[in-house]
Each structure stands twice: as structure tokens, then as C-alpha cells.
Amino acid sequence: MKELLIVAKSLGGGGSEVALIELINALPEELYNITLVLLDSDNEYAYRLKKNVNIVQLTFNSYFAKSLVSMYAFPAKVLKKLSVNYFISYYDFIANCVTNVFEKTYDIAIDFYGYGSFVTAFLATKIQAKKKATWLHDEKPYWMKSVQKYLGKYDKIYGVSQAVVDAFCREYPHFKDKAAVFYNVIDIEEIKRKSEQDEVIPFQDNFNIVTVGRLTEQKGYDIAIKAASILKKRKINFAWYGIGGGRDEKKLKKLVEKCCLENQFVFLGRKKNPYPYMKHCNLYVQPSRHEGYVITLVEARALCLPILSSDIPSAREQIQDGVNGYVADLSAEALADKIEYLYNNPSQMEKTVEYLKEHPIDFSTELLKLENI
């Protein structure tokens, strides 16, 4: 049995956290003894873990050090102004403040959080392992500037899509030989099972659209709301439901009010089980501005839903326009045009659904990549 250590930020309610849990659940228990080291105490999704995992909370010798760790990522404009030496001394200092002792030499150690954070530096300098890998979850790799020194200690740098790997290699070509794709895995049968659970669905007798994701600028809800405003003016009989929470909730609800869409665009909040809502919608829409690998698109494909996504590089790895779903340019007008087209041509959506049923998703080759780090 191999000793596997994974360092992550938390088990909170984000896409990368879901991806982490799904990866752990997919690993054969007879092959891996897993230790999960967490930076934060947010364990909202811990109930999703199906197996016994040794969970360790990182502790620090001072409140000051712990507070510094909360600055786990910096905006790109800040990164451009600060020298790399600043981050090296910053991360080295915090790593020396960790009070946990990891004496074991692990077979594999994974920095699953990535994002150019303290986690990447900590695993590189304080964990002994035969093989090390770090994960990249987004197409915007600017923050990796802060951990370039530590990337040399990793055997693999995994991007969750080819788009992520390509963006990273353009920015940091000297690490090209270490970079490879490792797609996020999900338990398809579990998603199907959960989609059948009883849930009070507030859908009306009209064209029901669902979007799942955090209420943040990245996820493009503002674009969706503006697209909904266009659809309303075109007399389309629809209702759009957003599932998720986030820092932009108040701002987005104000935009809904400004556009007089209280009856057409409804925020349902976070849902432990969003799959019944997805299963019963007429169209699943993902209007993201950028993504690493869109897990909700994988879930929508697993449920064989009619799908419309913004035309971003990582989405193109999953969606072939007109084959297994549809893509639209990242604008309210383009999104509204494509939704109106699908509303008026349901047979086109049925065609993509049939394709999804005939071409199930297979993740079996992804897990083998851990053996080849």
C-alpha cells in the first residue's frame, strides 16, 4: 500500500474542493493510505468523503503566522509590483512557523490547492516524498510567479485541462517538461443517484434554465442576468435559476432588480444536492469568464442535459458545438441569441442529449497517472 499525502486549502464549498473529494473517493482503498493536510478549518463538504482519510489541520506557532497564511493568493497587479524574493522570504518564514511534524517519507505528496500559494511552498520544503506533484486549476497562471523557486522540487505540474497547461507553459516555458493534463474526475453513478432524490423543485411551466456556481465575477452571472434581460424583451417564456453562494450575491441581486427580472432570474442559494434541479431543467447554462476544468459541465454531461457554455478554452475541451452541447461567445447578446435559438429548436437540444447518452464519460486512465509521476 502506498502512502499518499495531499495538502489542500480546505474542504469548503468550491469547485477545486469538490474535485479533491472526488479524486480521493475514486482512489482504490487497497492501494492508498491517504493523509489529507488542510490549511483552513472550513469543512463544509467533508460529508462527501466516502472513505477513511487521516485529516490533519495545519497549526502555527502564532496568530500572526496564521493570519499571514490567510493571504494565500494575491491579485495579478500586486504580483507585478512585488519581487519574487519577497514571496520566497514570506513563504519560507511561514513554513518555519508550522508546528505540525511530518516525519514520514511518503510515496507520493500532492499540492492540490496550487494557485501559487503557501501550500505549494510548504509541501516543497517541509514534506519528504519520493514523488511530488502540484495542481493548477485555472487558465490564469500569473500567481505562480510567487512559487517559481519551489516548482523545481516537483516531479509533475498537473493542469486540470489542456487549456490550463498551455497557459502555464506560455508563461513559464522552463517548466514545460514537468507539465501534463490531469482531468478532474467525478463519480458519475453517484451523481445520477443523487439526481433521483426527492427535492421540491420550484420550476414553473416554462423554459427552465439552471446555472450552478459561486456568485463571483469569474462565473459570469452578471452576463447571464443581462442575457436574461434581452430574452425578456424578446418575449421568451423562461425562468433562470442560479444555484450557489458567494461574495457578489448582493450586487447580483441588485442587478436583477435593476433589470426588473425578479420573476425571471431567481437565486436559490447553495444546495447540498443541486442535481435534481439540473436533471429537471430544460437547459443547463455555464456563462463563466474563465475556468480550469468546469466540473459542473462534467456533471451536466453525466446527466445527459442540454448544455450551453461560454466559448472559453477549457469548455471547448468538453463541449463540441452542436455535437454534445453548444457554446456561445462571452457576451449577453450572444448568450441570449443561442438560448433563443435552442428555445425555438428543441430538436437540436435532443440531438446533443442523444449523443451524450451514446458516449459516456470514462475517467479510468486519469487515476493511472498517479502511478507515473
For every predicted segment, state its role.
Residues A163, V185:
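Carbohydrate-associated surface elements
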Residues E17-E22, F207-I230, R247-K253:
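A conserved mid-protein helix/loop that constitutes part of the nucleotide-sugar donor-binding site
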Residues A334, Y341, S347-D362:
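A short, well-ordered alpha-helix in the C-terminal region of glycosyltransferases
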Residues R270, R289:
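Aromatic "clamp/platform" in nucleotide-sugar-dependent glycosyltransferases that forms part
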Residues P306-S309:
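Short hydrophobic beta-strand element within catalytic cores of glycosyltransferases
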Residues K253-G269:
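Nucleotide-activated donor-binding/catalytic signature segment of Leloir-type glycosyltransferases, i.e.
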Residues V298-E299, I312-G322, Y326-V327:
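Short acidic/histidine- and often glycine-rich active-site loop of Leloir-type glycosyltransferases
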Residues D321-G322, Y326-A332, Y341-P346:
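Conserved acidic donor-binding segment of nucleotide-sugar-dependent glycosyltransferases
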